Amino acid sequence: MRKGYVSPSLMCVDLMNVQSDIEKLEKVGVDYFHVDMMDNHFVPNITLSTDFIKALKKIKTPLDIHMMIEHPEQTIPELTCCDENDIICIHYESTLHPQKVLASIRAMGVKAGIAINPATPVCVLEDILPDVDMVLCMTVNPGFAG
């Protein structure tokens, strides 16, 4: 059985105190930092960018990047700062070719994850499971804290 992990979300972090907040969380020993990327197309909100992710790579704690964006294959090349300790998670519903996108993530040497929206049946993941390191089953429609 796989172990669970603690991955606090940075979506609601106070950007004026982000360094201090991250340092406090690192002291208590979190496993990952969850970074929500939103594009105002796949979901009706905009949050943290690839530039923010690049800045976060200065910390020791790995990143759990949740891409809530249309056509993630267009943004993934901007995440070459990620490494084998990080996870990049795409939404099944965000691309016509999820397995191809997952393969491109793994080709970068990064762990790959797949997320599904609440209305998406879990059975769509059957053929994808061998290609992922993580599955995220949303319990709320993506786009906002919840």
What is each stretch, according to the model?
Residues G4-N17, P44, P62-E70, H91, ...:
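Active-site mouth loops of central-metabolism enzymes
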Residues I46-M67, S104-G113:
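Alpha-helix-loop-beta-strand connector modules within alpha/beta enzyme cores
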Residues F33-L48, I90, V140-G146:
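Glycine-rich, proline-tolerant flexible connector loops at the mouths of alpha/beta enzymes
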Residues R2-V6, G29-D31, I59-L63, E84-D86, ...:
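Short, well-ordered coil/turn segments that N-cap beta-strands
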